[in-house]
Amino acid sequence: MKAENEEIINSFTRLLNYIYKNMAQTINQRIDALRALLKREGIDAFIIPSTDPHLSEYVAPYWKSREWISGFTGSAGTAVITTDKAGLWTDSRYFLQAEQQLEGSGIDLYKEMLPETPSILDFLRENLTANSVVGIDGKVFSTTQAIALQEDLAKNGITVKSIADPMYGQTALPCPKHPPLSTR
């Protein structure tokens, strides 16, 4: 019985490793597709929050672009993709989950609120140069957030550009459909 259980556990472990390996390859393909889009648009970095146009934390599948690009399924987190780096910022509720889900993806985990963790703005300032462009999907940022981001980065000669459509809708890879409108 013990040997049987060990074989089941080993088989399950091999299956999980296979899934994670292939999921990481898919994540890498998605990041490569996003980077190709950014290059075409003249954008050097893209910020992908976990929100929808209502700035909700829990969103319909269509608005889970951060989950789609990173594979991280926690409800809170922000991904930043540059031409050569990728990072995910999340809070302590999700540190362990993020470590597991990002493993092998090439996305670095930034643990928010820890003294050694750079903020997203610090990361952008450190990794971009003057005349760089940071892209956002303006539908999922508040006006206040977008203006603050724009003003802060402008001090370093970095501009912010809103891309009208969700970034994953522009890639050649499959993504969730927009939810139907309610007709109450």
Protein language model regions, located:
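Low-complexity, intrinsically disordered or signal/transmembrane-proximal segments
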Residues: 18-20
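N-terminal accessory/capping or targeting/presequence segment of soluble
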Residues: 24-129, 133, 137, 141, ...
